[in-house]
C-alpha cells in the first residue's frame, strides 16, 4: 500500500459492518509476506475491540492466481474460525476454506493493493444498511416469482423461468 491512508475507520467499518462478530466469535485475519501489515493489524485491533477472539496470521506469499493448498497450521486456523478475513488471496478455493464455509464460516476476501483510495471511499461512503434492505426486497421478489422478463432502454430483453 503506497498511499498514506488512515486505515482506522476502514478497519472499524470492515469489522463492525461487514464481519459483525459477537463477543467471543473467532476471527482469523490473514495476510502474507508481500503485503503491508498496517491494514490487517488495524483490523485485528478493531476485532479485538469488538470482543472477538481474533488472530492475525501472516503466511508465505503465493501468486494471486495460483491455487493455494495451505499447510496444516493455516488449514487448522481456517477450520477453527467463524469469520475469515483474507487480505492476500490464495485461500478462497483451498480445501480448508471450502470445508469451513460448508460448516457455516463466513469469508471476506479482498486485495486492496493499488486501489487503496477507492476501497476506502467505497466502504466508508455507502449506506450499507440501505443496500441490505434493498437486497432483502429483491430476494423477497425473487422468492415469489416463477417467471422473469427483463427489459431496459439499452436494449436488454431477457426471459427466464426461475
Cite the ranges covered by each PLM segment:
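Active-site bordering "gate/hinge" segments
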Residues: 1-162
Amino acid at each position: 500500500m503506497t498511499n498514506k491512508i488512515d486505515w482506522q475507520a476502514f478497519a472499524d467499518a470492515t469489522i463492525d459492518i461487514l464481519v459483525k462478530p459477537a463477543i467471543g466469535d473467532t476471527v482469523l485475519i490473514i495476510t502474507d509476506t508481500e503485503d503491508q501489515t498496517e491494514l490487517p493489524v488495524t483490523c485485528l485491533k478493531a476485532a479485538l475491540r469488538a470482543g472477538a477472539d481474533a488472530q492475525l496470521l501472516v503466511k508465505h506469499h503465493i501468486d494471486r492466481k495460483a491455487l493455494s493448498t495451505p499447510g496444516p497450521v493455516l488449514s487448522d486456523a481456517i477450520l477453527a474460525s467463524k469469520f475469515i478475513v483474507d487480505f492476500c488471496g490464495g485461500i478462497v478455493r483451498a480445501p480448508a476454506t471450502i470445508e469451513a464455509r460448508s460448516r457455516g464460516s463466513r469469508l471476506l476476501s479482498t486485495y486492496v493493493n493499488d486501489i487503496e483510495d477507492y476501497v476506502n471511499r467505497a466502504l466508508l461512503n455507502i449506506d450499507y444498511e440501505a443496500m441490505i434492505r434493498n437486497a432483502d426486497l429483491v430476494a423477497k421478489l425473487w422468492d415469489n416469482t416463477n417467471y422473469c422478463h427483463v427489459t431496459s432502454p439499452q436494449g436488454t430483453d431477457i426471459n427466464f423461468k426461475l
